[in-house]
Amino acid sequence: MSLEVSNINGGNGTQLSHDKRELLCLLKLIKKYQLKSTEELLCQEANVSSVELSEISESDVQQVLGAVLGAGDANRERKHVQSPAQGHKQSAVTEANAAEELAKFIDDDSFDAQHYEQAYKELRTFVEDSLDIYKHELSMVLYPILVQIYFKILASGLREKAKEFIEKYKCDLDGYYIEGLFNLLLLSKPEELLENDLVVAMEQDKFVIRMSRDSHSLFKRHIQDRRQEVVADIVSKYLHFDTYEGMARNKLQCVATAGSHLGEAKRQDNKMRVYYGLLKEVDFQTLTTPAPAPEEEDDDPDAPDRPKKKKPKKDPLLSKKSKSDPNAPSIDRIPLPELKDSDKLLKLKALREASKRLALSKDQLPSAVFYTVLNSHQGVTCAEISDDSTMLACGFGDSSVRIWSLTPAKLRTLKDADSLRELDKESADINVRMLDDRSGEVTRSLMGHTGPVYRCAFAPEMNLLLSCSEDSTIRLWSLLTWSCVVTYRGHVYPVWDVRFAPHGYYFVSCSYDKTARLWATDSNQALRVFVGHLSDVDCVQFHPNSNYVATGSSDRTVRLWDNMTGQSVRLMTGHKGSVSSLAFSACGRYLASGSVDHNIIIWDLSNGSLVTTLLRHTSTVTTITFSRDGTVLAAAGLDNNLTLWDFHKVTEDYISNHITVSHHQDENDEDVYLMRTFPSKNSPFVSLHFTRRNLLMCVGLFKS
């Protein structure tokens, strides 16, 4: 409690007596409750005598208390029902700030919507009357200018006029822009402009248009006309032209990289070097070659010659040394976990199994096995198969994770501590002896999330599992104790995807909060936060060398991030819908992305260019994967179809002819590269996985 006593000995006499009376009543109340130290201190500070205090009656105290309590109630009421001058003071400040922000959309007080519409109409006529060689590039300016004029009309309060303007001219635009325009038409108040993601993004970054120098010169000459001043102002504030020398692009080439909310990527977005090569593998020969025995001393020189011992033969599979890749990062570029002996043995086993791999081609397609989840009343939201193809994990809408064994071996749990102490730790099969045979089960459930599970991911060593959920958390599960060992919190919205690094230890997640985050299993804080997407990040994937992470977003872009610096080193545009799936090629140079727009795009990470677009699916492409030898690309989606593409021919044509967006082939990619299509029986695909021997495993959900 604080007490103001500075006016006791001065000021107005009436006010003095009133204040002193209240003070005496307070002292009387303190004395009543026997707060002696407080009473003495206050009497000394206020210079009050005991005689003055004795003159105050109990009724005086009650009267003052009633007045104080009444004033408190009045103050509380005034907080809810304030006077017109004060009641909306805070909201007035907010409205003033909003008005100031909205004023940015309108250049002057004499705003004339008709003037802007007439300017756009003339621009549209100019584009239509242009020569065919320039028309397609010039038409790319219509969408961003149309949207900016709509913002200005809506900010001026003319909602119906703004809606009428969009409805009148939206037919000029390509179909992939209609979805964005439909969302903008839902804006009903000028203030909603300040909260819309697309509006904020277009205010912060300029819309990028790639255009030949000749096309750009024609456009500049047109907007220099006095009647085009309003268009020229929009162009200078909100558009960025990335010009190049050479012929203007045709319709196909313009559409190939269009579709993003902020246009195409700038050249400087893809200029940084990317070390896409693979890291040098460990020398496995040292794991299998026994240590040389110490040489015996030859004491008797006259003794007959002893037979020489034969040197053990080297395994030709293991003696192959991997060549150093000039495009690979240094082994210490990012700190990678040191391989334990058990990890090396797992890699050795994988290498031996890979030696029996089937070489795939158009004449020798992979065999495919389809796992169908039946009677899943909880709803299957995701599925993942372990790298050694022995386990299947599925996430469900009821927040559970369920794991099945795909082999006769059952899922066993760790023995108790007393039994573990009795084991010989030097035993070669210690990993098997640690598990209790009596606890074996075909399937196990993991409970802990409080929302639908959107992704599961096995660790490379197959003893850990990651899961992410709508509850904004990521959980790390032990597949030895079948329990949650860590809960990672950092995202503030649902987490859509999570992936382990190929070398283990690190993992990456992405969320509705427009970010992706890099984590380490031994830290509950994110190591890197990748910020740059304009909408939620839907999918994520680790590069085979663990130095980079790819993300796909609802802003229709694909980005590549450097784990060491946290910077975006590639920005790739071309999708016409949210990016739903990603996969790196076995060599690390290429990235495939699937989308809600039904398309699959192949990207070259060396320069960020679009290699080709694969058109065959009729619905969202939910999952993509490459064969282990990198020759076949498998894709599947909600259209219940599995497609196999000749990726070897894609790269062969690209390298030999260097087909780029500027020189796009006229042939139908479906006819050239599609190897085979396999339909499922009313079962959308959830996951695809190639085994080490190139057997294709599919997981789907049967819809009755």
Swiss-Prot record:
Region: Disordered, residue numbers: 287-336
Subcellular location: Nucleus
InterPro entries given in the database record: G-protein_beta_WD-40_rep, TFIID_NTD2, TFIID_NTD2_sf, WD40/YVTN_repeat-like_dom_sf, WD40_repeat_CS, WD40_repeat_dom_sf, WD40_rpt
Gene3D superfamilies cross-referenced by the UniProt entry: TFIID subunit TAF5, NTD2 domain, YVTN repeat-like/Quinoprotein amine dehydrogenase
Keywords for this protein: Nucleus, Repeat, Transcription, Transcription regulation, WD repeat
Signal sequence coordinates: none
Skewed-composition ranges (Basic and acidic residues): 314-324
WD repeat intervals: 376-405, 448-478, 490-520, 532-562, 574-604, 616-646
GO cellular component: nucleus; transcription factor TFIID complex
BP GO annotations: transcription initiation at RNA polymerase II promoter
UniProt-listed SMART domains: WD40
Origin superkingdom: Eukaryota
Keyword Repeat recorded: yes
Keyword Nucleus: yes
Subunit structure: Belongs to the TFIID complex which is composed of TATA binding protein (Tbp) and a number of TBP-associated factors (Tafs). Interacts with Tbp and Taf4.
Family, as annotated: Belongs to the WD repeat TAF5 family.
PANTHER family registered for this protein in UniProt: CANNONBALL-RELATED, TRANSCRIPTION INITIATION FACTOR TFIID
Protein name: Transcription initiation factor TFIID subunit 5
